[in-house]
Amino acid sequence: MGGSRRRGSRHKARVRAVEILYEAEVRGVPVSEVIERRRAQTEPPINEFTEQLATRVDEHRARIDELLETYAIGWTLDRMPVVDRNILRIGVYELLWADDIPDGVAIAEAVAMAKELSTDESPVFVNGLLSRLMEKKPSLSL
């Protein structure tokens, strides 16, 4: 029972990380600024997992975006909806850099967020792109 509750809170934390990345991108401000503002204004306080996830995605963003551009067949980063871009950034980060998160969980969580936050087509797109990256994972240079 505790595991499902933890998964639920982790899912919410991931959604909040997407919101932080989205806000930073749309407003053109650093992720750290959005985190600081939310830390000061949010009740209950911002979750540590959320903060770490958003920060780490931001730290690896250049390489993540290169990988998305390379493996998103028929799509450029600019053509993707902003929310999808940020869901994918989290998925790629968790898939390639978060060793404590199984690949299947990283993909399933990203697909779940796409279902919750984006268009009807987004879950299939997110699943396909992250699955392609998972297959390529052994040969990717990070």
UniProtKB/Swiss-Prot annotation:
The encoding gene: nusB
Keywords in alphabetical order: RNA-binding, Transcription, Transcription antitermination, Transcription regulation
GO molecular function: RNA binding
Name by which UniProt lists this protein: Transcription antitermination protein NusB
Family annotation (InterPro entries): NusB-like_sf (IPR035926), NusB_fam (IPR011605), NusB_RsmB_TIM44 (IPR006027)
Annotated family: Belongs to the NusB family.
Superkingdom of source: Bacteria
GO BP: DNA-templated transcription termination; transcription antitermination
Pfam family, one: NusB
Free-text function comment from the UniProt entry: Involved in transcription antitermination. Required for transcription of ribosomal RNA (rRNA) genes. Binds specifically to the boxA antiterminator sequence of the ribosomal RNA (rrn) operons.
Organism: Thermobifida fusca (strain YX)
GO cellular component: cytosol
Cited PANTHER family: ANTITERMINATION NUSB DOMAIN-CONTAINING PROTEIN (PTHR11078:SF3), N UTILIZATION SUBSTANCE PROTEIN B-RELATED (PTHR11078)
